[in-house]
């Protein structure tokens, strides 16, 4: 049987509506949604090698800058040596494993092994990063080829192709300054002036390098560097670097805002003064149908007490499903919500009922001190707790009061176009919410405690009550046992008594029966004598009477 399309749509729409968050009922208890965004997850990253050439090519001004270059090399050594020693300490203890096949002459690469005995103490993160470091390291031949290429180049950004067709980007942050300013000014400036200018520039560049790699001195193996921080060492032009790296993803801005592009140190050359980095720039995958909602709450008054509804700050919806959302590994951008891992996890059925419109399922807690929002702007309307803050109509100068039977006040242009609340002047729009929410028209959820001290106190009281209840239960069990024992004993006594009475009764009845039988026999003997009387001469009437 075919179902008409209109009937099918009519049947489907209610199901879809119940699966969404009921913003209307939530707004009655002070919960509103401030934003909604798509959900994207970071997928597998692509890697690109980048070389920071710390020593610029100064062939054209070498005679005037020997002193400054010597001091600059000494400063670089204080940064590079600790990093190089830490990298060597773990990479020299990681060796490849060769797996033998059936033929002894053929072996294949199977993985790497960490010499733990030689390494000593290392955390799990350091071990994992060390193995990844070993896999991304260049061999000695590639290092020598890279050194030769860096010596000859005098460009700020240089693309160096290795024998395996791998492109390595070499960057020098001071080279443009030398090429464009110092070299053309050699004829107008003295040699001392050129040296001083280069010295100041190198000192500033060293400061940027120190601020960039300084945090990595403690743990250079597992430390990560953001591309934003790296841009200072690359001359400040981050767009030029990203274009040279070949990244042209549509989510570039979102990845930059979420700091998704990371760099790790893979090699340090103390003699040639350069650092090799492995840059990972990920791609994003949008999870279709998942919407992340941000929630904000406004306090409301019940009599003299101020409450607010306890809901998570972020939730996610996908069709009928509503789930919690962990915003810790996420970045929020205009392009959407970007997470480095799955941030969705199940929500309790009671909280789901709350979001679907059952206000009695929404827990509430008392406002402590001045913490908590007392007004918020949503859909152009001002939702305010005018019982706790001063609400004033700026247009008329009158005070907007909130009756005791109201928990919130909704102010729109039909009531007051310009509102002053808590010292802030706000122009509101046309009405989107009812003018007020009355206490008798809404079911409120159970009160709970969120403060650590209050939670501890409540738990202590609950434990005390449980102990008392346990003692009372033990006492009641003892009483029941005694009552049960007493009832059994009394019943036995009663049965024995009844039995004795029955036996005595039977004996008495038996004796009575025997006595009655004896009496009846005696009377029979009296009434029937052995000799008959002489009735001779007696009249017939007398005899007949006898």
Curated annotation (Swiss-Prot):
Known glycosylation sites: 25, 57, 63
InterPro entries associated with the record: Fusion_F0_Paramyxovir
Annotated signal sequence range: 1-19
Broad class of the protein's primary localization: virion
Membrane topology (UniProt): Single-pass type I membrane protein; Single-pass membrane protein
Location within or outside the cell: Virion membrane; Host cell membrane
Alphabetized UniProt keyword annotations: Cleavage on pair of basic residues, Coiled coil, Disulfide bond, Fusion of virus membrane with host cell membrane, Fusion of virus membrane with host membrane, Glycoprotein, Host cell membrane, Host membrane, Membrane, Signal, Transmembrane, Transmembrane helix, Viral envelope protein, Viral penetration into host cytoplasm, Virion, Virus entry into host cell
Pfam families the record matches: Fusion_gly
Residue ranges that the UniProt entry lists as topological domain Extracellular: 20-491
Cytoplasmic side stretches: 513-546
Region ranges (Fusion peptide): 109-133
Example of a GO cellular component annotation carried by this entry: virion membrane
Protein name (database record): Fusion glycoprotein F0
Originating species: Rinderpest virus (strain RBT1)
